[in-house]
Amino acid sequence: KGVTSHLISTVPEIEKYIEPHGEIGKFLAMRFKEYNSIHKGWSKEIWDMAAVGYVLNEDWAPTNTIPSPILLDDMKWASDKNRHPIKIVYEIKRDPILKDFIQKLENFNNK
């Protein structure tokens, strides 16, 4: 699993903090709940919020810079220090990302 496995939520959290906030909140809650019919003890990654969180605040998704890996024909990875650099996110800070989203949803709904 990647780092987005740490950016999870549950149906009770979505129902309490997302669903009450207008039509968009209802829609997002519906989509979240439709993903699995058994909600007891269930949580789900909200992977698409990770990319947005990084764009909004790089501190919410710290990175390391490494040379771009090379995918070989045998589906293994090789490295070459001369390749262009890429950033790898090594941690997702779930709480500030979700708090920011919920606050923005509340503000939008209260306009």
Region locations from a protein language model:
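N-terminal acidic, glycine/proline-rich low-complexity segments
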Residues: 1-111
